[in-house]
């Protein structure tokens, strides 16, 4: 059974927490479907080319139908002309969103969490809180403290997951390129797959692993 590594206040390993047995044997295809759904939903769909009805000009016939030796033409907006409309071009009317049901979303999240645990990249801490130093009635060195926490983990990049994130902690991590801090309600399978390691507050971890199949 896969386990999350529990860290103390100095980010040193002090124990482990087991993932529920239902996390075992989940098909990886659920994660594939969720990633496709996530990326397609984020697609802006702004590419647009003009067809022959939308380009300007073309009000008159460019040359006589017969007698010129050239192929007949009715308008310079035809796709065969330079500056004419585009055939089968990009359109912004297409909907790229791919549907996925709640069960597949849950299975994708559980599979991604299981993968992190198997790779020993899932960590649990009691609390993620950056307070900084108060100087002249202002909180300073927030980012420095957050960076020290990240460096102590010795990971390539890290996703931090809080139960109830305060504004100072959010600000502290906002300037770190290799970190992202989110609230537990924002957690999804794509973010779990995108980062090489995950650090969760204990309350957030318990919230995620509780059985939601009966809800």
Swiss-Prot record:
Compositionally biased tracts (Gly residues): 56-71
Disulphide-bonded residues: none
Key word RNA-binding present: yes
One annotated GO biological process: translation
Recorded GO CC terms: ribonucleoprotein complex; ribosome
Residue span of region Disordered: 46-72
Gene3D superfamilies for the chain: 3.40.1370.10
Keyword annotations of the record: Ribonucleoprotein, Ribosomal protein, RNA-binding, rRNA-binding
InterPro entries hit by this protein: Ribosomal_uL4, Ribosomal_uL4-like, Ribosomal_uL4_dom_sf
Pfam family, one: Ribosomal_L4
Coiled-coil boundaries: none
GO molecular-function terms, A-Z: rRNA binding; structural constituent of ribosome
Known role: One of the primary rRNA binding proteins, this protein initially binds near the 5'-end of the 23S rRNA. It is important during the early stages of 50S assembly. It makes multiple contacts with different domains of the 23S rRNA in the assembled 50S subunit and ribosome.
Assembly and binders: Part of the 50S ribosomal subunit.
Family as reported in the entry's similarity comment: Belongs to the universal ribosomal protein uL4 family.
Protein name per its UniProtKB record: Large ribosomal subunit protein uL4
Biological classification of the source: Bacteria, Pseudomonadati, Campylobacterota, Epsilonproteobacteria, Campylobacterales
């Amino acid at each position: 059974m896969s386990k999350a590594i529990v860290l103390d206040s100095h980010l040193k390993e002090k124990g482990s927490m087991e993932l529920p047995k239902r996390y075992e044997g989940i098909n990886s295809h659920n994660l594939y479907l969720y990633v496709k759904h996530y990326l397609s939903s984020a697609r802006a769909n702004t590419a647009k080319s003009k067809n022959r009805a939308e380009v300007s000009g073309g009000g008159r016939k460019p040359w006589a139908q017969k007698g010129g030796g050239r192929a007949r033409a009715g308008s310079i907006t035809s796709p065969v002309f330079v500056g004419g409309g585009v055939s089968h071009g990009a359109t912004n009317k297409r909907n790229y969103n791919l549907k996925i049901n709640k069960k597949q979303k849950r299975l994708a999240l559980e599979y991604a969490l299981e993968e992190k645990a198997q790779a020993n990249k899932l960590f649990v801490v009691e609390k993620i809180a950056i307070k900084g130093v108060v100087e002249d009635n202002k909180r300073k060195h927030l980012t420095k403290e957050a960076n020290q926490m990240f460096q102590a983990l010795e990971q390539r990049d890290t996703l931090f997951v809080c139960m109830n994130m305060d504004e100072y902690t959010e600000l502290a991590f906002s300037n770190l390129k290799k970190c992202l801090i989110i609230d537990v309600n924002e957690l999804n399978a794509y973010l779990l797959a995108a980062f090489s390691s995950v650090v969760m507050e204990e309350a957030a971890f318990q919230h995620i692993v509780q059985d939601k199949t009966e809800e």
